[in-house]
A protein has these predicted regions:
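Non-transmembrane, aqueous-exposed alpha-helical and coiled segments at domain scale
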Residues: 42-43, 53-54, 58, 65-87, ...
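Duplex nucleic acid-engaging cores and interfaces of nucleic-acid transaction enzymes
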Residues: 31
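Conserved anion/nucleotide-ligand pocket segment
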Residues: 90-91, 95
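N-terminal amphipathic, basic-rich helices that act as targeting or association modules
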Residues: 10-14, 20-22
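Short, small-residue-biased leader/transition segments that mark boundaries at the very start
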Residues: 2-7
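Glycine-rich loop at the start of a catalytic domain that most often binds anionic cofactors/ligands
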Residues: 36-41
């Protein structure tokens, strides 16, 4: 029950974002999720783990296809044994999301097997669709928001160096692409589920080139970052350490008291989220900022309870929300009331939705 409640809250939160995000296109937004109950241990048999996940995904996707109106010979056909209370509505498409990013071809195969009228236009992306990571479309859209925020502050992030902290790593779509959209990004700290990256005084040019190298390196992590390019006092540290040493340089850039010489990883991440930098770039998964009046239980992301901070504690001047649900809505309001500049996730990362809609429409036209 506990796990189910967590996923239920997460899906409902994503539904809210998706419905607003879909205002840029015609179809309304929806969201779904599934939790496999009998997954093998991936550390023991990764192939079996993936096969079970795909089998569950096939069940999950097949269900709405079976229940949705179809078009046959230009006429709407209602599925047998279905009692419906709405009008004809054969339009149903799916898009890759958390945990299913590489499953578009599987979904399209189901669509074709079931005779769904959209065929391989059913699931955007995949081998016959737009490659969102290759295009960098989600990050590019969010970066337009970032540029606007900087412009309102009288700065140009495309021609002037600026400091940044981030959530994610260079192997990721949104984080990786986002950290390559300006040659003037000085990434001073970042973290993912494995490592904490610290580079208190990075050279904008050489650090950009190194991030670009990691972006194209298969399955890269922060541990692959060339240590010789990290500025004095920085480094890459596993989150499994009991404590991480803090140099004077790191303390200075993150706004940590001089008396603090080391911190446990979770407390260091707290400091990164509150760093007095120009940009906070969220390209990760999870909810890291809430409002003072909200409890961690209300947020519904138990995995990050130990990391989460309040909106009023965030000292970055600008926030770019490449990832979904990185902040609660009340957390955004609290941050904005302190003078911070941000939009919302459904504004910043809506470009991917628009791209998928274009893809479906083009395929319908060609078919």
């Amino acid at each position: 029950r506990g796990l189910g409640d967590v996923y239920k809250r997460q899906v409902l939160g994503l539904v809210k974002a998706q419905m607003v995000k879909n205002t840029v296109i015609v179809p309304t937004g929806a969201k779904g999720g599934f939790v496999p109950q009998h997954l093998p241990d991936p550390a023991v048999d990764r192939a079996a783990w993936l096969a079970e996940g795909i089998a569950c995904y096939r069940i999950f996707v097949s269900s709405p296809v079976t229940l949705t109106d179809n078009i046959v010979g230009g006429e709407v056909v209602v599925p047998p044994n279905v009692v419906r209370y709405d009008d004809d509505d054969p339009y149903l498409v799916v898009a890759a999301d958390k945990g299913t990013a590489t499953f578009s071809d599987i979904a399209n195969a189901i669509s074709i097997e079931r005779g769904h009228w959209l065929g391989d236009a059913f699931a955007s992306g995949g081998s016959v669709g737009y490659d969102h990571k290759g295009m960098g479309i989600t990050a590019r859209g969010a970066w337009e928001s970032v540029k606007r925020h900087f412009t309102e502050l009288g700065r140009d992030c495309q021609s002037e160096d600026f400091t940044c902290v981030g959530i994610g790593d260079m192997a990721g779509d949104v984080f990786g692409n986002g950290m390559l959209l300006s040659r003037h990004t000085r990434l001073v700290a970042a973290f993912n589920h494995l490592h904490i990256f610290l580079d208190p005084f990075p050279d904008a040019a050489s650090s950009f080139d190194e991030r670009q190298r990691l972006f194209v390196l298969p399955r890269s992590s922060w541990a692959d970052y060339d240590a010789s390019l990290i500025s004095e006092g920085g480094g890459v540290y596993p989150r499994s350490l009991k404590a991480i040493p803090l140099s004077p340089e790191v303390r200075g850039v993150l706004g940590i008291a001089d008396t603090v010489t080391s911190l446990p990883p979770n407390e260091l991440i707290h400091a990164i989220l509150q760093a007095p930098v120009d940009l906070f770039w969220n390209g990760g998964i999870g909810t890291y900022v809430k409002a003072l009046g909200e409890t961690h239980a209300q947020v519904g992301d138990k995995a990050n309870d130990a990391l989460r901070v309040n909106g009023s504690q965030v000292r970055a001047k600008v926030v770019g929300e490449g990832g979904n649900l990185g902040w609660t809505q009340r957390g955004r309001v609290e941050y904005a009331l302190t003078g911070g500049r941000l939009n919302t996730d459904f504004i910043d990362n809506s470009a991917g939705v628009d791209t998928s809609d274009h893809e479906v429409n083009i395929k319908i036209l060609l078919d």
